[in-house]
Amino acid sequence: MEKTELIQKAKLAEQAERYDDMATCMKAVTEQGAELSNEERNLLSVAYKNVVGGRRSAWRVISSIEQKTDTSDKKLQLIKDYREKVESELRSICTTVLELLDKYLIANATNPESKVFYLKMKGDYFRYLAEVACGDDRKQTIDNSQGAYQEAFDISKKEMQPTHPIRLGLALNFSVFYYEILNNPELACTLAKTAFDEAIAELDTLNEDSYKDSTLIMQLLRDNLTLWTSDSAGEECDAAEGAEN
């Protein structure tokens, strides 16, 4: 299928909320090997975020049921098997995205904005793997996630305005990584607060095109800070990450 046709089909699939189809189309576009435009990059990101998002929330629900089920309950094995099925799907999706990132996207990125976008994506998908990993595998996955986020973070600080939505989105997700994966609320709050304060200080540099995106992510940073510094800090913080652009 021609690239233009694949993109048209991906947009149609998005409107129909058929994200698996959308992801298949954008995977095919990526595998053609050319650098993606901003629009194509966003289509790819939205597709896989929805595809993996369904599995992440399903995994959480099933895990919660599993933990509450008595060990003597005959249903426990069925629940465990189902969790492992969802886990397997989630791993497969993450592996596909990480392969696309390493083979095509990061290597082809010619500007800092794209590089940060893809490295952030790499951090995200290793983070999703870390959510379901255990033992040595989990440690390696966490290291991979942190390494990608840190590389993206260093480039973003050097090359992008503090109000840039990609830089803000990276700070949002990196802080969620510190809070949820490394269980380090102090570092999570420091990172989120610094990103928020730096953006506030330079509000006059806000690009009109990205005003809505930037202010939305700033609001999410503030919501997470409120949540993390309150006594009720808990599972729901990742909902903020889910609403990120």
UniProtKB/Swiss-Prot annotation:
The modification 3'-nitrotyrosine is found at residues 82, 104. The record marks 56, 127 as: Interaction with phosphoserine on interacting protein. Keywords: Acetylation, Cytoplasm, Isopeptide bond, Nitration, Phosphoprotein, Ubl conjugation. The modification Phosphoserine is found at residues 92, 232. Ser-232 is probably phosphorylated by CK1. It is found in: Cytoplasm. GO terms for molecular function: 14-3-3 protein binding; identical protein binding; protein domain specific binding; transmembrane transporter binding. GO terms for biological process: negative regulation of DNA-templated transcription; negative regulation of monoatomic ion transmembrane transport; protein localization; protein targeting; signal transduction; small GTPase-mediated signal transduction; substantia nigra development. The keyword Ion transport does not apply. Coiled coil: none annotated. The modification N-acetylmethionine is found at residue 1. The modification N6-acetyllysine is found at residues 3, 49, 68, 115. One of its GO terms (cellular component) is focal adhesion. Pfam families: 14-3-3. Abundantly expressed in brain, heart and pancreas, and at lower levels in kidney and placenta. Up-regulated in the lumbar spinal cord from patients with sporadic amyotrophic lateral sclerosis (ALS) compared with controls, with highest levels of expression in individuals with predominant lower motor neuron involvement. Its main location: cytoplasm. There is a cross-link at residue 49 (Glycyl lysine isopeptide (Lys-Gly) (interchain with G-Cter in SUMO2)). Belongs to the 14-3-3 family. Adapter protein implicated in the regulation of a large spectrum of both general and specialized signaling pathways. Binds to a large number of partners, usually by recognition of a phosphoserine or phosphothreonine motif. Binding generally results in the modulation of the activity of the binding partner. Negatively regulates the kinase activity of PDPK1. Homodimer. Interacts with CDK16. Interacts with RGS7 (phosphorylated form). Interacts with SSH1. Interacts with CDKN1B ('Thr-198' phosphorylated form); the interaction translocates CDKN1B to the cytoplasm. Interacts with GAB2. Interacts with the 'Ser-241' phosphorylated form of PDPK1. Interacts with the 'Thr-369' phosphorylated form of DAPK2. Interacts with PI4KB, TBC1D22A and TBC1D22B. Interacts with SLITRK1. Interacts with RIPOR2 isoform 2. This is 14-3-3 protein theta.
